[in-house]
Amino acid sequence: MLAGCGGGGHGTATKTQNRCPTTGAHVTFPLLDPKTPHDVDVLTNLGEFAFRLDVQDSPCTTSSFASLVRKHFFDGTIFHRIVPGFVIQGGDPTATGRGGPGYTVIDVPPKNALYTEGVVAMAKSSTEQRGSAGSQFFIVTAPDAGLPPDYAVLGVVTKGLKVVERIGRLGNKVTERPTRRVAVLRMTLTS
C-alpha cells in the first residue's frame, strides 16, 4: 500500500504527485523527499516550537500536512483540546474536533510506534482506519501516552518543548477544553 506513495527526486518535494490512498475529496500534492529534513515551525500566541516531519515512516501524511502548511491552512486555528499530562490537539479549522481538510490519507504506523513526550501524530476518530490522517494533530505531553499504534506519526518536537508543555497545562482535565485560548498564528515549512 505505501509503495505507491514513494518517489525519487531531489529537493524538498518530488515532481511526482501523490499516489497516496485517500478518502473524501480528490487531492494531489507533491511528495516530500525523504532524504531532506523538513521542519514545521509553529508560532503561537504563547511562543514558538518546531517539529521535524517523519517522512520515512509517514510519506503520505507528512506530504499532505506540508501541503496544508504551504496553503496556510493552520494559520488562525486553535488548540481546541488540551488534556493536562496527556496531549494537546489542534489542526481543526472549525475548533469543534470534527473539522478537517475534506479528505484523509492513510499511513499505517509501525506496530512498535510509541507516543512519548514530544511525538506529533495525527488524530482520528475511533471509527476511522488505523493511520487515517486529515488535518488534526496532537502532541504528546506525557512521558508515554500509552496509546495503541493506531495514529499516523507526523514527527517529533525538536525545538520549544517548554512551550508545548506550557500549552499542555492550560486545559481542563474533565472537559478536555482549553482554559485559555491558544492560537496558531503561523505555521511555516523549512527544508
Language-model segment annotations:
Residues 2-191:
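Cyclophilin-like peptidyl-prolyl cis-trans isomerases
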